Amino acid sequence: MLQTKDYKHFCVGDVEFEGASAAAKALPGDRVRVEDGRVVEILERAPHRNIVGTLELASKYRYGMTSKNHPIYLFSPFTESYPPFYVGSAHKDTSQNVLAIIDFAHWTETCPRGNLQQILGVAGDLATEEEALAIQASPLRWKKLEALVSPTPIEAHMKGITFHVDPPGCKDIDDAITLNPLDGKTEVSIHIADVASWLLANPELMSKAEQIGQTLYRDGVAIRPMFPIELSEGIFSLLPGEDRRAVTLRCVWNKAEKKLEAFTWSLEMIRVTQSFTYHSVSKSMFASELEEICSGIANRPVTDSHEWIEQLMLLYNREAAKVLREKGAGVLRRHAGLDQARYDTYERLGLPADKLAMAAGEYCAATEDDTRHWGLGQDVYCHASSPIRRWPDCVNQMILLGHPANASIKHMNTRAKSFKVYERDMVFVRALLTNHDKTLKGTIAESGRIWIPSWGRIVKSDTIGFEPGSVVAIQYFCDATKRNWKRRLVLKLEPIETITSS
């Protein structure tokens, strides 16, 4: 399979080569045959659909006419792994470039031909740019669903007061909690929505959900859900007052010994009877017990209600990972830890080294030797607590329930990276298109890397003339000629002293 990040440097398996001409009109993802450092045959085209980019209507250049006598324009994909395309359009207003979606058609000319699927709007308009980034990150959407087959009924019903804790307005509710008093102890039940049973009863849902990978959120609102809304905010969701299936981790909090014991798993019916926000739960009848239990889980005082729920979900995921490891199936989450040299440098400069020098996590098979999650200090860890919004959790839930489940680890990691790119680009597009004062303060972290606290991230840029630790004033601009927001962001650095003395 042909792989490339820039359509200049290519690899197929262990063979690397350079130059677009050597790719011989193959596109990323195509199955190809390579001889002597070049593609000699395209064995199978990948489905190149939903390609997002800029249709250059405002350019003075045209590249011919279509069979319907429409002008052909240059289309520049956001993704640099694709070359520019020729795309015909009947759009009347050619005074401004537009953002559009195309599908690959064929490649017989200098550039591949694309079929225009949709014009999103004018390039440079914030709403249009945000929608384009969302489609780039998560291009697939659900169409109308057929009636679903219900899973086999289950008899076990949870007793007690079951509650969920989520932000106001949350509808895709993955998790709920039940605390039942025992003699000097507390039975703790962590319930996660049973999505797996619905998938097993309706396997047609699996393929598309896997391709989508996870729910995309904008400002806390699900804008491109992994499952159709009627499922993610309906029959899958642990909505108050509704009987719902749940995969439950149950254990007992021993108050005297300050520890959890007697862990068991079960599939059962629950009904959420109380809803809390993170603010209201801290004032509820459960607050003191949640604080005590979650402080015991963390082995330190935990007073923030957000972290109460976080600790319970971490516990669920740790215990699920142990089951997956024992079964030799499923998907774990590993983390390589710190770049020690970078950590030492950043700490010396007074930067948030724990965050900035941390390696990215990744998915791996439960059978691999190296599964250590350095950040959490766990030999095994997994994602299992959010099956409504994340595909690896669905795979792991199926295995927890005793069913086989196939998983493409590479695809999971690719999808996760796409969502990280979306988060980065949203910071850039909003900064460039909404802020009137385009001046920031930053710190040179190392050569070519600047820490910008107000953005909460490291940005790559030319730092020649500045030593690590230098505090700089940053003016930033948009170079609209570049393909994507990572390239469009242009920084100009000046020493703080120069700015303040002028």
Identify the residue ranges that each predicted region occupies:
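Feature marking long nucleic-acid-engaging regions of large polymerase/nuclease enzymes
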Residues: 19, 87, 166-338, 376-390, ...
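Charged, low-complexity, helix-prone segments enriched in Lys/Glu/Asp/Gln
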Residues: 28, 41-45, 130, 208-210, ...
